[in-house]
Curated annotation (Swiss-Prot):
Residue ranges of domain ATP-grasp in the record: 9-244
Enzyme class: ligase
The protein's required cofactors: Mg(2+)
The organism of origin for this protein: Pelagibacter ubique (strain HTCC1062)
Binding site for substrate: 264, 321-323
Keywords: ATP-binding, Ligase, Magnesium, Metal-binding, Nucleotide-binding, Tricarboxylic acid cycle
Binding site for ATP: 46, 53-55, 99, 102, 107
Gene transcribed to yield this protein: sucC
Pathway stated in the Swiss-Prot or TrEMBL entry: Carbohydrate metabolism; tricarboxylic acid cycle; succinate from succinyl-CoA (ligase route): step 1/1
UniProt similarity note: Belongs to the succinate/malate CoA ligase beta subunit family.
Protein name per Swiss-Prot or TrEMBL: Succinate--CoA ligase [ADP-forming] subunit beta
Biological classification of the source: Bacteria, Pseudomonadati, Pseudomonadota, Alphaproteobacteria, Candidatus Pelagibacterales
EC number: 6.2.1.5
One of the protein's GO biological processes: tricarboxylic acid cycle
């Protein structure tokens, strides 16, 4: 689950990190009234959307007076920002954040995330702050340091010094940076975060270490432990279809292709998407129905897939372990009759009761295309939509 910048900064502040003082609001009048409490020569106005690249899209402005802030806020609120992360449709700005300006001397990059390969927490640091870290990794990889921390260990001063070595800080600033690393680590563990990113992390001309921007993503599977974080969820920033899918306990992510996918198991879903690409088409979604598939769940999944107007065909790929293929097949047949599917539908079943499942599909009277294996299924759905 993602949250807004102003929310991320408040959590960082709670754990001891230093952030600029700021206020957020849903209306211009509210913003201006709150901004009067800020002690600053200049105001930094920021659009609050769940996407990076706001500055280049006109979503970050530096203003000299309250009057300038009011004019800029009126222009920005309700505007649709298009960045490299929003896609061509962009995101509408529905809340604004204004904070005190900072006297920047140097900009750094810092992030903390889970390294699944080593089962450790990894810190990524760079002296190239304010830039897209992927771009830095591609052009100047020597500018990036990665430091792995065992999740069972406390983070030490020595660990912190490794992380911040590339910043080349003087003594007092170095102490501040070490304290910040410990705060980020404590926050990461304490909130069950997947990622904490501070970009840029700055050294001011007054020699203060400050988190100038922040992005946090939380493990959705651990949110039951954090009701206070659940309250920060902004449904306006999420795809309505993905919200609907979550209500039916479906793991769904919309993509840009033309072949809808319904699969049980995340690994099999990824393999299904890969083989669709191998045969020259693009998947329209990732959809994992999980270990159980009632008629209602299959029907909901098909409706969600078909709500995407780009879908020209559907591939259902099921390996029956806990899930019985005959139960899934009956769910597909019942749902297909109810929805009246008009696009080609290829079904591949394997595993528990797959023979019974195939019989149900063959005797359904529906124009379903049966596949023997994943390779066969991918070829058939690609051919069917041509």
């Amino acid at each position: 689950m993602n949250i807004h910048e102003h929310q991320a900064k408040q959590i960082l502040k709670k754990y001891g990190a230093v952030v600029p003082e700021g206020v957020f609001a849903f209306t211009v009048d509210e913003l201006i009234e709150k901004a009067k409490s800020l002690k600053t020569e200049k105001f930094v106005l920021k659009a609050q959307i769940h996407a990076g690249g706001r500055g280049k899209a006109g979503g970050v402005k530096i203003l000299n007076t309250i009057d300038e802030l009011s004019v800029a806020a009126k222009e920005l609120l309700g505007k649709t920002l298009v960045t490299h992360q929003t896609g061509p449709a962009g995101r509408e700005v529905k809340r604004l954040y204004v904070e005190e300006s900072s006297n920047i001397d140097k900009e750094f990059y810092l992030s903390c995330l889970v390294d699944r390969a080593s089962s450790k927490i990894v810190f990524i640091s760079s002296d190239q702050g304010g830039m897209d870290i992927e771009e830095v990794a591609e052009k100047t990889p020597e500018k990036i340091i990665t430091t792995k921390i065992d999740i069972t260990d406390e983070i030490s001063d020595a660990d912190c010094e490794k992380i911040i070595a590339i910043y080349a800080l003087a003594d007092d600033a170095k102490k501040q940076a070490i304290a910040l690393i410990k705060s980020v680590y404590k926050m990461f563990l304490g909130t069950d975060a997947n990622m904490v990113e501070v970009n840029p992390l700055i050294l001011t001309k007054e020699k203060k270490i400050i988190c100038l921007d922040a992005k946090v993503n939380f493990d959705s599977n651990a949110l039951f432990r954090h009701p206070e974080i659940i309250e920060l969820r902004d449904l306006n920033e999420e795809d309505p279809t993905e919200i609907d899918a979550s209500k039916h306990d479906l793991a769904y992510i919309k993509l840009d292709g033309s072949i809808g996918c319904m699969v049980n198991g995340a690994g099999l879903a990824m393999a299904t998407m890969d083989i669709i690409k191998l045969y020259g088409e693009e998947p329209a979604n990732f959809l994992d129905v999980g270990g159980g598939a009632s008629k209602e769940k299959v029907s909901a999944a098909l409706k969600i897939i078909l709500s995407d107007k780009n879908v020209k065909g559907i591939l259902i790929n099921i390996f029956g372990g806990i899930m019985r293929c005959d139960v899934l097949a009956q769910g597909v047949v019942d749902a297909a009759k109810e929805i009246n599917i008009s696009v080609p539908l290829v079904v591949r079943l394997a595993g528990t009761n797959f023979k019974e499942g195939k019989e149900i599909l063959d005797n359904s009277g529906l124009k379903l295309i049966s596949a023997e294996n994943l390779d066969d299924a991918a070829q058939k759905i690609v051919e069917a939509i041509k």
